[in-house]
UniProtKB/Swiss-Prot annotation:
Function: ATPase which is responsible for recognizing, binding, unfolding and translocation of pupylated proteins into the bacterial 20S proteasome core particle. May be essential for opening the gate of the 20S proteasome via an interaction with its C-terminus, thereby allowing substrate entry and access to the site of proteolysis. Thus, the C-termini of the proteasomal ATPase may function like a 'key in a lock' to induce gate opening and therefore regulate proteolysis.
One Gene Ontology term from the biological process aspect of the record: proteasomal protein catabolic process
Subunit structure: Homohexamer. Assembles into a hexameric ring structure that caps the 20S proteasome core. Strongly interacts with the prokaryotic ubiquitin-like protein Pup through a hydrophobic interface; the interacting region of ARC lies in its N-terminal coiled-coil domain. There is one Pup binding site per ARC hexamer ring. Upon ATP-binding, the C-terminus of ARC interacts with the alpha-rings of the proteasome core, possibly by binding to the intersubunit pockets.
Organism: Saccharopolyspora erythraea (strain ATCC 11635 / DSM 40517 / JCM 4748 / NBRC 13426 / NCIMB 8594 / NRRL 2338)
Residues that hold ATP according to the record: G284, C285, G286, K287, T288, L289
Name of the protein in its database record: Proteasome-associated ATPase
Cited PANTHER family: AAA-FAMILY ATPASE, PROTEASOME-ASSOCIATED ATPASE
Pathway: Protein degradation; proteasomal Pup-dependent pathway
Amino acid sequence: MQHDRPGSRPEEGGEQQIGGDAELNSQIRLLEDEVALLRRKLNESPQQVRLLEKRLAEASERVSQLTERNAKLTETLKEARSQLMALREEVDRLAQPPSGYGVFLHAYEDSTVDVFTSGRKMRVSVSPNVATEDLRLGQSVRLNEALTVVEAGAFEQTGEVCTFRELLPVDAVTRSPRALVLGHTDEERVVWVTEPLAESGLKAGDSVLVDSKAGYAYDLVPKAEVEDLVLEEVPDVGYNDIGGLGNQIEQIRDAVELPFLHSDLYVEYQLRPPKGVLLYGPPGCGKTLIAKAVANSLAKKVAASRGDDDGQAKSYFLNIKGPELLNKFVGETERHIRLIFQRAREKASEGTPVIVFFDEMDSIFRTRGSGVSSDVETTIVPQLLSEIDGVEGLENVIVIGASNREDMIDPAILRPGRLDVKIKIERPDAESAKDIFSKYLTRQLPIHEEDLKEFGGDQASCVEAMIQTTVERMYAETDENRFLEVTYANGDKEVLYFKDFNSGAMIQNIVDRAKKAAIKAVLETGQPGLRVQHLQDAIIDEFAENEDLPNTTNPDDWARISGKKGERIVYIRTLVSGKNQESGRAIDTATNTGQYL
C-alpha cells in the first residue's frame, strides 16, 4: 500500500505541466499576431498620410479656383445690375409724358401690336413692362413719343350712342366678334365688339356705346327712362272696392278672367281669347279702378287654381302713362312701346298674368292723318298694332286701354282681333250713386248723436238714410241743380243738370268735403260726428267749383270728353244760381282737328 502511492504522484504532476504549456503557447501566438498587425499598420501609415496630403492639396486648389470664379461672378453680377438699372431708367424715361393714346386692335407673335391712334391704324412695338397676352380687344393703350405701347388702360366711356341690330360672324383672322349697328341717322355700320360687351348678352334694339373712328362698340347704354313711364305693381284694389259698375265688371271678368282660368274650355270650343279690352267713357267713372281690380282678381284666382296661398298671389299691372310716353326724338316712342311689351313677355313667361294698361289711349294712338303739326301717330300706331298681334302667342298677357275720346283712337286698334271687347263706363245713375256712396260712408264712421237719435241709435239705418238723402239732393231736377243750357247746331236747346255730369270721383270728393267739415266742427264745437248737413253743404260746394269749367274750352270737344254725344253743340250758357256769371257766350266750333283739348 505504501509503495503504490508514491508511484502515482509523478503522473499527475506531468499532466498539469502539459496543460500550462499549451495555455502559454496560445498567449504567445496572440501576442505575435498583435505584433504583426502593429508592424503592418506602421508600414501602411506613411502611405495614408501621403494620400491625405494629396487630397488636401487638391481641395486647396479647388477652393482657390472657386474663389477666383466667385470673384468673377460677383463682378459680372455687378455689371449686370448696373446695366439693368440703366435699362430700367431708360424704360421709365420712355414712359414719361407727353404720351398719346390709342385703341388696341390685334397682337402678333413677334411682340408687336396693331393700334388705332391719331386717326390711323399702326403696327407698333410693346414695352417690356406691358404683358401683350393681357391686352384685350378695344382696350385703351398709352403710347410714348416713339409710338411704343407703355401702359394698358381701361375701355372708353364716351362715344356715339348707336342701336344694336345683330351679331355678325366672327372675323376669321382676328377671331373677334363683330356687330351691325344703326347710327343716329339710321346709317348701318359694322363695328368690332369688345369682349365685355360680347359677354353681356346683346339683344336687338339695345343701345351701345360706339367709337366711330376706331370702329369699336364698348358698352351697353342703360336707357331705362321707360321705367319712369311704367308702374309695375300688384294692385290692391278688388271688385268690392268699386261701386255702381256691376254690369261692366261682369263683362270684363268674362273677357279677361275666363280665358286665363279656363283655357282648356276655350281650346275645346276652338274659341280665341280676346287680346285687348277698351274701357271708354267720361272721366272719373272708374276705368282705371276696374283695370287694377282685374289684375288683383286674376292673381288671386290663378294662385287658388295652383293651390298657392293668397299671400303668394302674384300678377303684374303695367300702368302706361300715355302722354309721357311721347318723345320728341324720332323712334324713341316706338322704342318705349317695344320695351314695354318686351317686359310684359318676360313677366308672362313665368306663368304670371300680366295686364298692360294704357291710360289716356287717345293721346298717343290717335287716328293716323289727324295731326296738324305732327304725324307721329303714323309710326306709333303701327308699332302698337304689331306688338298686339305679337301678343297672340302669349297666354298671360292682355292689353287694356282707357280713353275719354274713343272716337279719336285709330280704327285699326279698335277692330276685332286687337281690342276685341269694348266696354262703356257710364256715369252713375241714382242706384249706382248709392252703391258708390256706401263705399265711402261706412258704418265705422262716427255719426253725430242728433242724427242717430232720429233712428233710435241704429248706426246702419242712419248711414243708409244719409246716403238716400244725399243722392236725392244730387239727382233732383230742381232749379238749384240746373247746370247748363246747351244749344245744338240744329237750334234745339237742352237743360243739363249736375246729375248729368256726376261721377265716382265727384262722389268721393263730396264725401271727403263732408268729412273735413265734420273734423272742423269737432275742433270748433267739440261735438264729434258726421251729419247730413255736412253732405248737403259739400254738394253745394262741389257744384260751385264745377260751374266755370265748361267755358274753358271748345264746347263740342268738352261735351265729347264729358260723355255727351250727338248733335254738335254751338252754344253753352251756365245756369248756376248765386254766382256772378255772364249770360253765356257763343263759341264757334271749328272742324274737328283731332287735337286733344
